[in-house]
Every structure is written in structure tokens, then in C-alpha cells.
Amino acid sequence: MAFPKMRLMYVCLLVLGALCVYFSMYSLNLFKEQSFVYKKDGNFLKLPDTDCRQTPPFLVLLVTSSHRQLAERMAIRQTWGKERTVKGKQLKTFFLLGTTSSAAETKEVDQESQRHGDIIQKDFLDVYYNLTLKTMMGIEWVHRFCPQAAFVMKTDSDMFINVDYLTELLLKKNRTTRFFTGFLKLNEFPIRQPFSKWFVSKSEYPWDRYPPFCSGTGYVFSGDVASQVYNVSESVPYIKLEDVFVGLCLERLNIRLEELHSQPTFFPGGLRFSVCRFRRIVACHFIKPRTLLDYWQ
């Protein structure tokens, strides 16, 4: 009796193993399709209702978002992303989106864009592996439509940004050209495990180490850097990790990363909340919309 049971178990394990291999290869092929087939350029589908020539902003915040993150966008609009003046300096926030195959989501974003006038959109599928396209879209928008901005911050929808403290530090820093700061990553290596979210193949990036770059959760740069990165980007090998791609552009431009403050101010790994502590940080990751609204009170 033991032998038939063992044989049945062996057959089941073989079938299970074969299924795992099949679905793994399917996922990998899907990953490859999403990584490399979508458009890298194109016309803007949506542009924000703003004129930087008449009222040049001190700080433009570019927030990567997706169609389903309406709650996140609304929370940001009510908190740190609200257009206002800090220390006499004007701040403006815009949301970066791609396209979706959902007609309902497309219609909702169309209505949202008409209502708020703060969405930037191009014709590429809005998936994680197109984040470089999304970020470069925002940088292109600054280059073409808002080069008057003194500073630009690229960040994500699940972030707490202390725009008051950031403005204070930028004014103290007094660096208006070739400036780039954030959470510095100076000794990072490509992840070669195929099932990692951050997997990069040898064909996509053949080198064994990344150039210095800042965490994509939030980095800040002087307005002139937007045009420099945009202009050099066509000569830089494309990689789907947007923060690494921007780092490659900075390396080509010989722009060195700098610390914003002697103490840590960017927290891509999150941070336990306290009123006193959050008054002296710039960016904190993993913040849900309801939490953001509570923190802002």
C-alpha cells in the first residue's frame, strides 16, 4: 500500500512542478512584454491648467500616480500638494499618469483632470515597468512648459512631503544650478533574480554596479537639471528602473548628488510618526491617504 501512495505523491509533485515552471515562464514573458514594447515618446494627452511664465513657481512637485489612486491624489490635494505660498515662494503640484484599457477609469480621470487641472498624461500603458516613461514625461513637461521653476521634486502617491521644511532647506542651501538631492544610494547592484520586482537582465543593464542615484520615492533638483536630463536622455541606455535611469543621465552630465542636510531628511523605508519628528523631515514613504490626512491636522 505504501508504494502506490508514494508513486501517487511523486506524480502529484511532478505535475505541481510542471505547473510552477509553466506559470513562471508565462509571468516572465509577460514581464518582458511590459518592459520593452510600450511607446517611449508621443504627444501629451493632458496638460495642466497653469502658466509658469506669468507666475514662475519656486517648487514644482511631480507625483507619479495611477488611475486607481484617486483617494491618494485627493488626500495630497488637501495636504502637502495644495497650491500655496511658503515663505513667499509659490508651490505647485501635478500628477503623472499613463493610459489604461479601462474605459470607466479613463472617463473618471478625464473628469478629474477637467475639475482640478493638475494632471499630466501621455500615451503609454500605466504599469510599474513603464515608470521611467512616466518620470521622463514629467521632466519633459518641466523642460517644455515650466523651465522657470527654481526647483522640481519627483515623488510618489504614498508619500508624506513636508513642503515647508523642504522650502526652508532649499532657501538655506542656496544652490540654483546643477543641484540634485534625495536619499542617496551610492553603492547599489543590479538584482538578477528573475522573480524580483526590481529584476534587471544582463541584456538590459550589462554592468555589475549602478551609478550613484537617489531613491525614486522622492528626489529634488534645480530647474536647469530637468532640461539637461531631458536633452541627454536619448543617448543613455534605457532601463525600466526610473531612479537608476535618472542616475545614468546624471552620470553622463557629471552632476554629483548632494546631501540636503547634515541630518537624514528622506525616509524611503518609512518612519514612526511623531509631530516633533515630522517637522524636521522632508519625505516619508508608505503613507496611506487616511493617515496622511490625520498627520496633516
Swiss-Prot record:
Keywords: Glycoprotein, Glycosyltransferase, Golgi apparatus, Lipid metabolism, Membrane, Signal-anchor, Transferase, Transmembrane, Transmembrane helix. GO terms for molecular function: N-acetyl-beta-D-glucosaminide beta-(1,3)-galactosyltransferase activity. It comes from the Eukaryota. The gene is B3GALT5. One of its GO terms (cellular component) is Golgi membrane. It is a single-pass type II membrane protein. Glycans are attached at N130, N174, N231. Catalyzes the transfer of Gal to GlcNAc-based acceptors with a preference for the core3 O-linked glycan GlcNAc(beta1,3)GalNAc structure. Can use glycolipid LC3Cer as an efficient acceptor. Residues 29-297 are lumenal. PANTHER family: BETA-1,3-GALACTOSYLTRANSFERASE 5, BETA-1,3-N-ACETYLGLUCOSAMINYLTRANSFERASE. GO terms for biological process: lipid metabolic process; protein O-linked glycosylation. It comes from Pan troglodytes. Pathway: Protein modification; protein glycosylation. This is Beta-1,3-galactosyltransferase 5. Its EC number is 2.4.1.-. The chain crosses the membrane at residues 8-28. It catalyses: a globoside Gb4Cer (d18:1(4E)) + UDP-alpha-D-galactose = a globoside GalGb4Cer (d18:1(4E)) + UDP + H(+).
